[in-house]
Amino acid sequence: LDVRIESVGIDFIDGFLKIEIIGLLFLIFSLIGIINAFNIVDGFNGLLLTYCLSVLLTLILAYESSSGIDWLTYIVALFFAIFGVFLFNFPFGKLFLGDAGAYLLGALIPISLIEYTFDNGFSPWFVLAVLIYPVTEVFTSIVRKVFFRKMSAMQPDGLHFHMLVYKKISKKVGFRRVRLRHFVVTLFIFSINFPFLLAANLYKSDSIFLIFLCCWYLLFYIMIYFLMIPKYAFGKK
């Protein structure tokens, strides 16, 4: 695979990325980060799979003929491959991704997006806009753990966004069946992410709009997060 991050839309940084070794290290760092982010998001039945299917579906809906039929064939094939697993995973949990499955999707989706973006000359912010959910999850987790809870960023604390949604649903709705709670959590987060993914695909060449979209998602995410997070989350563990 000839995968490269050739630009981030900032001239100063782009100059460094043109240096092959720096560009390669930045790519490796970015992929390692997003692969782990996908694993973090894989918390409940169907959650990561629904997100991946949403990404691929919006790519299909906003397909441009200039991208080539091979690209469309690949995305459709990947969509149905993931959908096959999804049918057994959601909502009854008959089949699970596991760490290996989450890492695999964490590599396939971003690499596909990077190739798609730079092969077609779309805004480099398009990749971030599509991956904004797992990126935001990791970013807020690091800030919460390191700066507020004074603990290692690698140490689990049970305060990820999907976990807080689950706790709220368990209290408010009171579903006895765990799988039904998983179902509601997945649909809730899907309803938040899908409009942003669709908007990113419709304006994938508009850097200003994509930057605004990323900022709006981050603010929206933080607003909902603060409405759910318990007070002890900002103290030491």
Role assignments for model-derived ranges:
Residues L202-K237:
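Alpha-helical transmembrane segments and their immediate juxtamembrane interface regions
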Residues K167, L197-N201:
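Short basic/hydrophobic patches in alpha-helices and adjacent helix-turn junctions
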Residues G121-W125, I142, M154-Q155, S207-F212:
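Extended hydrophobic-aromatic, low-complexity segments
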Residues N45, P91, T117, R144-F147, ...:
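Membrane-interfacial segments
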Residues L1-F139:
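"…together with the soluble PPM/PP2C metallo-phosphatase catalytic core" -> "…together
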Residues G84, T136, T140, I192-L197, ...:
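Alpha-helical transmembrane segments of multipass membrane proteins
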Residues T140-R179:
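Cytosolic, membrane-interface loops and tails of multi-pass inner-membrane proteins
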Residues A100-A102, V178-I192:
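Select subsegments of transmembrane alpha-helices in polytopic membrane proteins
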